[in-house]
Amino acid sequence: MIAKLIWKDIRENFINTLIFAGLILAMTIYSLVKNFKDVRSLAVLSILIVAFSFIMVLGYAIYRGFSSLKREKDRNTLEFLLSLPVDGLEIVTSKFLAFFTEVLLLSLCIALFSHIPLFYMLITKAIGKAEFISAVKTITYIAFYFFLLALFLFIVFQFYEILVLSLKTKNFFVNAILFFVYLYLLSELIAIFKKVFGFLPDQPPILHTIGGETFTIMGGTNYQGLAAGALAGVVLIVSGIILFNKKVEV
C-alpha cells in the first residue's frame, strides 16, 4: 500500500518537478550565455545556480509540507476515502518518501547543471584537474546540504499540518500562535540534541576553494547541527505517525 501511495503522490506532482528542473536548466544556460570570462565569475556562477535553485526547492518543500495532508483531506471524495488507509504509518511515510524522491531528482539536476561552468573552465584550461576536483567536492557538498535542508523543512511543516488537523483549530490567529510556539519548541529540541552530539566536531565541514575563492554556507553548519537536525527529523516523523493514528479523523 505504501508503494501505491508513493507512486500516486509522485504522479500528481511530477509536473511541478519537471517545471523546477526546466527552470534550473534555463537559468544555467542563460547565465552561461552572459559570457562570464574570468574564473572567479564562473566559480560564483556555480554557487549561484545551486543557491537560487534550492531557494525554489525549499519554497516547494514548505508548500508541500503545509498542503500534503490538508489537500488530501479537503478532497473529501468517496474514491479517496475508500482508498485511504487509516494507518498513519502508511500516510506519513508515503508522503515523506514521495517528496524524498522528488527532491532527490531535483538535487541531482541541480548538482549536474551547476557543474556545467566547472566543466567549461576545465575544457578551456582556466583551471587544472586538481582545482576542478576541489570545486566539484564543494558544489556537491552544498547541493547535499540543501537536499537535507529541503527534507527537514518538509518534515517540519508536515508535522505542523498533522498537529493542526489533530487539534481541529480553524482560527488563523490561533494557528499562527501555535506555529511560532511549535518552532520555538523545535529549536529547543534541536539545541538539546546538539548537546547529545557534543562528541562530534564543533566546526563546519571543510569546503574547498573554487578559482582561488573559499566559499562557506550560511556561516557554516557544524557536524553537531547536522546530526541534531537529522535526529529531530526522525522524531517528528515518528511523532507524526503516532499523532495521526490517535487524533486525525478522516
What do the PLM-derived regions correspond to, one by one?
Residues C109-F119, L186-G198:
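C-terminal TM-helix exit segments that contain a strictly Trp-centered aromatic cap at the helix terminus
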Residues R11-I15, L89-I110, V181-L185:
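Alpha-helical transmembrane segments of multi-pass membrane proteins
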Residues V33-A61, S94-L165:
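Secretory targeting signals
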Residues A51, Y141, Y145-L149, F179, ...:
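Pore-lining and gate-forming transmembrane alpha-helices of multi-pass membrane transport proteins
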Residues K170-F180:
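Internal alpha-helical transmembrane segments of multi-pass membrane proteins
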Residues L69-F100:
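Helix-loop-helix units of permease transmembrane domains in multi-pass membrane transporters
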Residues M1-S67, F159, L165, F172, ...:
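Hydrophobic alpha-helical transmembrane segments
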